[in-house]
């Protein structure tokens, strides 16, 4: 059965450590020089959403140290600060918060992926580890990004801390991607196993992520605003690192500090639609029957301040600024790139051909037929924030190199048994598209990298290609089509030109989905 490639939990890169692009090469070709600049842009995007800088931009203390400012809100500090967190990037976020606010912190509890502290220590990322005498207790769980008993114990500790708070207290909540699996708290008498079984049955029958989240929230004590309700009447400040397109607060980690807008009737409609209502465990029926209304209604979240402190759009904005410093005409195309990787690759390939023609030809010579195809493909991808026409106009007016940036999370349907990830597969497919016809007197480079530093079950973040990929691969007797058919992009890039096209970042400590760069440099 086809399944979407998933990015595995991965984290942590010291901001000062440079990215590496495979083994050293004897000489720096023009393509490698262009790739080095693209690397700098990717580096800047990831650096902008590192835990330390994010927290420092968001939190500040007044000179007396007795007031905490969060954006334009101020909170009094008087031995009343507590902290909880859950997610793949939360260990580094907690370390940064502890560094800034540790003297005011009474107690903290965080739930992080199994093995993360050992991985951080092994990588030498000491700045992302809590100090030995920190007041923050760390629970590791959710092995393979699945809720388990360890994560359940962490959720119970977080709930107990929240329920002890008073109106004089302030709770700082740290949230990142992966937080849902790290905060399992089914409403009794529903068990963790029963909730997981129901979720798996829904997924197997084709339920959407939105439908799955609706069911999860209805059966959870902490999701869908449940954590905010548990902490009431304390003030709650939730700092959120978004790994979801559009940054919907109710979706990230299933919205523990955001009031749910779904009712029990919505849940029953979903269960009926997938033919599961009659087969529900008695415990689930009990919970749904006694929930006459949404238990985490909007009236319970007036004491909460939710702040997105890191996102794909913030990362791309920084990369755009750095591109302009390097002399590029730079523009962000979209932060919502999604859909099947084949269609996304076709979009980028067609965009490259049209943009290259705009850059090197007069207005009268623009490829109108291909432009029409490009707009049609863009409409099929349904990218809500796509700035396509604006980008083409900017390219046509540009007098020098151009950099188009995008972000999001395409999906790969597995058909083979090879090794790779969505970023490497996208890069390889775009390389194939770029080789379909000459692009004129312009060098074109495409880069796709995961901001978490690990693309699928590999130790690289992604890869980059140029328009001569097909001819260069043929010269090395590499049939890229065979690698694509087997979803074996990692093996291809390891073999191609000594692995120099792989993007090695190491563990980054953050995740705001993927970054795509399409770079044009007139010859």
From Swiss-Prot:
Main subcellular location: cytoplasm
One GO CC term on file: cytosol
Keyword Cytoplasm among record annotations: yes
Modified residues (N6-acetyllysine): 200
GO biological process: fructose catabolic process; protein phosphorylation
Modified residues (Phosphoserine): 60
Main EC class the enzyme belongs to: transferase
UniProt-recorded name of the protein: Glycerate kinase
SUPFAM superfamilies assigned to the protein according to its UniProt record, in alphabetical order: GckA/TtuD-like
Gene3D superfamilies: Glycerate kinase, MOFRL-like N-terminal domain, MOFRL domain
Enzyme Commission numbers on file: 2.7.1.31
Organism lineage string: Eukaryota, Metazoa, Chordata, Craniata, Vertebrata
Family statement: Belongs to the glycerate kinase type-2 family.
GO molecular function: ATP binding; glycerate kinase activity
Cellular localization per UniProt: Cytoplasm
Catalysed reactions listed for this entry: (R)-glycerate + ATP = (2R)-3-phosphoglycerate + ADP + H(+)
Organism encoding this protein: Rattus norvegicus (Rat)
Keywords attached to this entry: Acetylation, ATP-binding, Cytoplasm, Kinase, Nucleotide-binding, Phosphoprotein, Transferase
Gene name of this polypeptide: Glyctk
